[in-house]
């Protein structure tokens, strides 16, 4: 069983990249690809996968941290994929916060980021870019060559080890270049394997449903800012 993790900010083009990758793998290697989509409140991506006859399951974390929800269900997702006779499972994570850390050691890891998000955005994205094997840049056809080069330089500044590939989410151009960078080891199970980096910390009173504001309601794993004195701000 082959596994691939695909992470990135919302609306960066993760689903489009997976759709093109699944098509190329099917046409070139005869591999049957399935997808497990992890999201927070809602997702309509299942329709896009089903339209291309790609088996898909969608999990919504609702009021839980999407990262913790993801890692608690990825082993079960692999078992589903194996029982469905799939050759490769692509795990698409929600990527709702830049502290998300979905990549697993030895499992090929992609981070998708779009070129319209700002030239310094790569520096603001945490483990899902820093620990990725390959960074896929989408929407690069909308910006200039100079902007693409600056964006790529900022990516390499954060993760100099990763390959950087530009993929057109509409036409699929660049998908073959992406495929050439990927290596898919076989896994029977993820039992006892480790994440590449720790997940966002928990647990505070707001994690468990507290909605009131004030120091008296703030308990658990908290971090307070030091604003210093205000004398020089007057």
Where are the regions a protein language model picked out?
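Short, surface-exposed amphipathic charged segments that create phosphate/polyanion-binding patches used
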Residues: 70-76, 176-186, 205-210
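Short, solvent-exposed amphipathic alpha-helical segments in soluble enzyme
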Residues: 21-23, 50-52, 126-130, 151-156, ...
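Nucleotide-state-sensitive switch-loop elements of NTP-binding domains
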Residues: 2-104, 118, 140, 173
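Inter-motif core of Ras-like GTPase G domains
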Residues: 95-116, 124-133
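Short, glycine/polar-rich helix-capping loops at beta-to-alpha or helix-loop-helix junctions
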Residues: 42-46, 120-125, 147-154
């Amino acid at each position: 069983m082959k596994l691939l993790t695909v992470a990135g900010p919302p609306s960066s083009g993760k689903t489009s990249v997976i759709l093109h990758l699944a098509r190329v793998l099917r046409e070139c290697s005869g591999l049957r690809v399935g997808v497990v989509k992890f999201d927070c409140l809602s997702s309509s991506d299942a329709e896009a996968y089903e339209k291309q006859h790609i088996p898909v399951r969608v999990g919504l974390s609702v009021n839980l941290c999407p990262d913790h929800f993801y890692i608690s269900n990825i082993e079960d997702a692999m078992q589903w994929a194996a029982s469905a006779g799939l050759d490769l499972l692509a795990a698409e994570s929600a990527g709702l916060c830049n502290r998300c850390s979905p990549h697993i050691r030895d499992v090929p890891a992609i981070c998708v980021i779009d070129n319209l998000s700002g030239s310094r955005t790569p520096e603001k994205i945490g483990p899902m870019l820093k620990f990725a094997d390959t960074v896929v840049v989408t929407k690069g056809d909308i910006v200039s060559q100079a902007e693409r080069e600056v964006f790529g330089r900022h990516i390499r500044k954060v993760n100099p080890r990763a390959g950087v590939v530009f993929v057109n989410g509409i036409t699929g151009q660049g998908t073959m270049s992406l495929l050439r960078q990927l290596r898919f080891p076989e896994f029977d199970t993820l039992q006892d394997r480790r994440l590449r980096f720790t997940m966002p910390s928990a647990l505070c009173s707001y994690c468990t449903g507290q909605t009131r504001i004030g120091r008296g309601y703030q308990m658990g794993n908290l971090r307070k800012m030091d604003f210093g004195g205000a004398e020089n701000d007057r």
